[in-house]
Regions:
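ABC transporter nucleotide-binding domains
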Residues: 1-251, 320, 326-330
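Short catalytic/signature loops enriched in Gly
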Residues: 80, 243-330
């Protein structure tokens, strides 16, 4: 049974510059499935469409962003949601936080600087379930954060009194207060030192193991995916380049872009300079024809410049969009 099924999703930003209107094709024909009880990673360079994708699948579709085509369907144990056609009222009352929660990039974006952490918990919970017994609520929140490894004192603190790592842990605790079926984490380790990153990732893994929910982890850091994710999707210029179990992505990458991402990771004991990828990501308001990676690809063929490669299944749970793979050249 799938938790989320995304089919042929196209989500564009409508922009206007110098009197000319145009579409920025941030997500362009994306299809994938999420299953219960897994950690699914989404990786790629800045401006590849990662954040736009999670905006759409979480129902945060506001101008200038518009979903033009495709479907985003959830199945929460029989409660089915069509995210592209759900009303804002139903989304707020029945889906956000209760079924889908969102750990935003940068914990200070979530926490109100003039309210104590407990008050922020109250604001979220009271939106869905009327708090009638404050003492019982306090005890429930104490148990919740202690279970996640946070001290009780955090509840009585203001955000500025906490370290960056502690604030990020609080943001994750807020996202899990209703034990939702899907947790979307957008760059949860950004701006944290490596020791704190390890603690945050350990917390995410523990939550998923305890609650058996699904985590959609979005980060450009391939090392994070290597340590946490069960499956990884590689995005490039608004499209899926490759999707596979984490072990396959790292040990047998098929797409040239995925190969570059893996080869760019530092290796302990080796001091050689890593080869950089020529060029820059394309302008999504005027993307190149054919495969969008072809201007930077070291293996480019004539077909790559004119024909969009299909996302094909090469073996179980391993999909790739590359003419070279189809031809058996990689």
């Amino acid at each position: 049974m799938t938790l989320l099924s995304v089919h042929n999703l196209r989500a564009y930003y409508r922009t206007k510059a110098y009197g000319i209107s145009r579409n920025v094709r941030a997500v362009d024909g994306v299809s994938f499935d999420l299953y219960p009880n897994e950690i699914y990673g989404v990786a790629g360079e800045s401006s590849c469409g990662k954040t736009t994708l999670i905006k759409v699948i979480s129902g945060n579709i506001k101008p200038p962003l518009k979903a033009l085509e495709g479907s985003v369907n959830y199945n929460f144990d029989g409660y089915k949601v069509d995210m592209l056609h759900i009303s804002e009222d139903e989304l707020r009352r029945n889906v956000r936080w209760k079924q889908i929660s969102y750990v935003m990039q940068g914990s200070m974006s979530v926490l109100n600087p003039v309210r104590k952490v407990l008050k922020t918990f109250e604001d979220i919970v009271d939106t869905h379930e009327r708090i009638t017994d404050k003492k019982a609520f306090l005890e429930q929140m104490r148990i919740h954060i202690n279970r996640l490894g946070l001290p009780t004192e955090v509840l009585n603190a203001y955000p500025h009194q906490l370290s960056g790592g502690m604030r990020q842990r609080v943001a994750i605790a807020l996202a899990t207060v209703f034990q939702p079926a899907l947790i979307i984490a957008d760059e949860p380790t950004t701006a944290l030192d490596v020791v704190v990153q390890r603690g945050v990732l350990h917390m995410i893994k523990n939550i998923q193991a305890m609650s058996h929910n699904t985590v959609l982890l979005v980060t450009h850091d391939m090392a994070v995916h290597a340590n946490v994710a069960d499956r990884v999707m590689i995005m490039y210029a608004g499209r899926i380049a490759e999707e596979a179990p984490t072990e396959s992505i790292f040990n047998a990458p098929l797409h040239p872009y995925t190969q570059h991402l893996i080869n760019s990771l530092p290796v302990i004991g080796k001091k050689s300079t890593k080869a950089s990828l020529k060029g820059s990501p394309p302008n999504l308001a005027d993307p190149p024809s054919g495969c969008r990676f072809h201007p930077r690809c070291p293996y480019v063929m004539d077909e790559c410049r004119t024909v969009v490669p299909e996302l094909i299944t090469v073996k179980e749970r391993h999909r790739v969009a590359c003419h070279l793979v189809k031809e058996g050249s990689l």
